[in-house]
Every structure is written in structure tokens, then in C-alpha cells.
Amino acid sequence: MGKLTILVLVAAVLLSTQVMVQGDGDQPAYRNAAPRDDNPGGAIGKFMNVLRRSGCPWDPWCG
């Protein structure tokens, strides 16, 4: 029974080492992060944001 326990522990250590080497290691998981809302005003906010970034030709509308 003792040999089986040691064998299971060694297997667990080897598998965890393999996962750390092949995985991201200590890098943060950016792929799982929620996307940032650059346009909180919805479609209208997005349109106005595009106008502001491109140098709006319609000054009264670009607030």
C-alpha cells in the first residue's frame, strides 16, 4: 500500500510539472478576461467615439 501511495504522488508531481511547462506558467490568462467596454453609450456612443477619434468634421455634433 505504501508503494502505491508513493507511485501516485510521483505521477501527480510529474503531471503537474508537465502542465506547468506546456501551459502558461505564471502568465495571466488574458484570453479569459472580459472585454473592456470602449463604447458605454451603445451604438450612438460608438458612432460619436469614432467621430472624436477621427477628428470630427461636424463640430456641433461632436460634444
UniProtKB/Swiss-Prot annotation:
Disulfide-bonded cysteines: C56-C62
Pfam families referenced in this protein's UniProt entry, alphabetically: Conotoxin (PF02950)
Membrane-spanning segments: none
Record comment regarding domains: The cysteine framework is C-C.
Function: Its target is unknown, but this toxin may modulate voltage-activated calcium channels (Cav) or calcium-dependent potassium channels (KCa).
Similarity-based family: Belongs to the O2 superfamily. Contryphan family.
Protein's recorded name: Contryphan-P
Naturally occurring in which organism (per UniProt): Conus purpurascens (Purple cone)
